[in-house]
Swiss-Prot record:
This is Zinc finger protein sens. One of its GO terms (molecular function) is DNA-binding transcription factor activity, RNA polymerase II-specific. The gene is sens. Residues 141-155, 518-533 have a biased composition (Basic and acidic residues). Residues 1-21, 110-216, 313-334, 354-412, 514-541 are annotated as: Disordered. It comes from the Eukaryota. GO terms for biological process: axon guidance; chaeta morphogenesis; compound eye photoreceptor development; negative regulation of apoptotic process; negative regulation of transcription by RNA polymerase II; Notch signaling pathway; peripheral nervous system development; photoreceptor cell differentiation. Residues 157-169, 194-206, 355-383 have a biased composition (Low complexity). A zinc finger (C2H2-type) spans 413-435, 441-463, 469-491, 497-520. Transcription factor both necessary and sufficient for proper development of most cell types of the embryonic and adult peripheral nervous system (PNS). Essential component of the proneural Notch signaling pathway required for proper sensory organ precursor (SOP) differentiation. Correct expression requires expression of scalloped (sd). Repression of rough (ro) in R8 photoreceptor is an essential mechanism of R8 cell fate determination. GO terms for cellular component: chromatin; nucleus.
């Protein structure tokens, strides 16, 4: 074991015999410091749970003269054990001695009280831990430290630290000389979980409740207690209502009900003013009477007024409809009058034109009778010719004949049977179907046949009842346009067919023929030559 012993310290020099007497007091003080340091090391080792066999090696007063090196040595062992690295100094004898009789010095009353409170807290904490270990684990009653608890613990620890610092400063002020020799107390870590008094059981939050039969029972009991508390509070509030306040509320309620059943004067004006102004009071009473009668059943004049009002309300939409109908009729009359005026103007213009054209028509008829023998002679000489050069030469005598020549100059295709001329050969071939008695268009309803498709279509209107041609004046409808033209002559008064023997004129040609037969005894013209029936092929056109 000799190789394990450290070298001697340079500070531990043997004193001379001459200086033993002088430095006796100093040596005694030094040995006391070493003994106190040894006690401190032993206490710290016991607190850190070091092995007992290492204690002789950890500290030997003969090897190290200064106790200031021991905190550095113990610091490494503390880190190995997992404790925080906090600077530590050897404890003074005052920190080791717990009893007042064992101390060599006296403390202030505040310091004494503080030490006593700390001892009591430690004892109560140990007892509480022992009881907690003995109790069975119940997950439903496990407490959870909240922010309020930590804040409260921090406040208690800060107050303890401040009291300690204040007491230490007072001790230094009272004993300035002893504070120089005695080492300061070590720095201890603050325990945030410690408190001066045992914490009361707090209500847990909803997040840390674990289901168990005990927790369910506790929950139901807590709900029952809360319901009982709320009922007690409600009963207390009802009993605590001031009777004066209750009476005031009752009076206000009755006043509001009576205001609906009493005259206005009871609330609007004082009684003195109502007595002075009797007329106003009478008017108010009448108003109240009418109001009560109205609320009772709308009797008397009010019922009549109400019925009149409802009748007017119901008649308003009918009046509006009548006004709209009258306006529409006026607009239609105006439109029909304007259309009638236009038709009358057109009829007058046509009548004047016909009066001017009648002598020209008579001249044209005379010329036509004169041209018939010439045309017959020309047809005998040229049976296949359809040209009308002879007719054009004979009609160039007058201005009207010149205009007619211009109109007929484009008509180069003439019928051999009746002398009609056409612009196109297709039109002539369709016209020849009349003379040949060929009817290729039958009616799908009755089987009647027609020469032209337009005639067949007009005939089908009789079966279908369709009348597409409508009069703009009287809105009468017709199946054929010719009938509409004849009908319009009634509204305009236009009579295009006039008798050359008298001054009478007619709207239809049939009426003119009947007039001649009855009045002037004219026989209908008898044709000497009967129309020939011939078949015309499409190649002849």
């Amino acid at each position: 074991m000799n190789h394990l012993s450290p070298p001697p310290s340079p500070h531990s020099q043997q004193p001379s015999p001459a200086g033993l007497g002088c430095h006796g007091a100093a040596l005694d003080k030094q040995w006391m410091q070493r003994a106190s340091a040894f006690n401190t090391v032993i206490a710290s080792a016991a607190a850190q749970k070091l092995n007992g066999r290492d204690l002789p090696f950890l500290y030997n007063p003969l090897l190290y003269s200064s106790a200031l090196l021991w905190p550095q040595f113990l610091l490494s062992s503390a880190t190995a054990l997992g404790t925080p690295l906090t600077p530590m100094t050897p404890k003074s004898p005052a920190s080791v001695v717990l009893g007042q009789r064992d101390r060599d010095f006296a403390l202030t009353p505040e310091k004494e009280h503080e030490l006593q409170m700390n001892n009591n807290n430690e004892n109560s904490k140990q007892d509480y831990q022992e009881q907690d270990e003995d109790m069975p684990l119940n997950l439903s009653t496990k407490e959870r430290i909240t922010s309020d608890d930590s804040n409260r613990d921090q406040y208690h620890s800060s107050s303890n630290n401040s009291s300690r610092s204040s007491s230490s400063s007072e001790v230094e002020q009272l004993h300035p000389m002893t504070s120089l020799n005695v080492t300061p107390p070590p720095l201890s870590a603050v325990n945030l979980k410690s408190s001066s008094t045992p914490q009361q059981q707090r209500q847990r939050s909803q997040g840390n409740i674990i289901w168990s039969p005990a927790s369910m029972c506790e929950r139901s009991a807590r709900r029952e207690q809360y319901g009982l508390k709320m009922e007690e509070q409600g009963d207390e509030e009802e009993h605590q209502v001031d009777p004066i306040v209750r009476k005031f509320k009752y009076e206000r309620r009755t006043a509001s009900i009576s205001s609906l059943q009493s005259p206005i004067s009871s609330l609007s004006a004082p009684a003195s003013n109502a007595v002075q102004d009797l007329e106003f009071e009478v008017a108010q009473q009448q108003l109240y009477a009418h109001r009560s009668a109205f609320m009772a059943g709308l009797t008397g004049n009010n019922l009549e007024l109400l019925t009149q009002h409802l009748k007017l309300k119901s008649e308003q939409p009918q009046q509006q409809q009548q006004q709209h109908r009258i306006k529409d009729e006026q607009q239609q009359d105006n439109r029909s009058a304007a259309a009638l005026m236009n038709l009358v103007a057109a009829a007058e213009f046509g009548y004047m034109r016909n009066q001017h054209q009648q002598p020209q028509q008579q001249q044209q008829q005379q010329l036509h009778h004169q041209q018939q023998p010439q045309q017959h002679q020309h047809q005998q000489q040229h049976p296949d010719s359809t040209a009308t050069d002879v007719a054009r030469r004979s009609s160039s005598s007058s201005s009207y004949q010149g205009e007619n020549e211009e109109k007929r100059s484009g008509r180069n295709f003439q019928c051999k049977q009746c002398g009609k001329s056409f612009k196109r050969s297709s039109t002539l071939s369709t016209h020849l179907l009349i003379h040949s008695d060929t009817r290729p268009y039958p009616c799908q309803y009755c089987g009647k046949r027609f020469h032209q498709k337009s005639d067949m279509k007009k005939h089908t209107y009789i079966h279908t009842g369709e009348k597409p041609h409508k009069c703009t004046v009287c809105l009468k409808a017709f199946s054929q346009s010719s009938n509409l033209i004849t009908h319009m002559r009634k509204h305009t008064g236009y009579k295009p067919f006039g008798c050359h023997l008298c001054d009478q004129s007619f709207q239809r040609k049939v009426d003119l023929r009947r007039h001649r037969e009855s009045r002037h005894e004219e026989a209908p013209p008898v044709e000497d030559l009967k129309p020939l029936k011939m078949e015309v092929s499409s190649s002849s056109c």
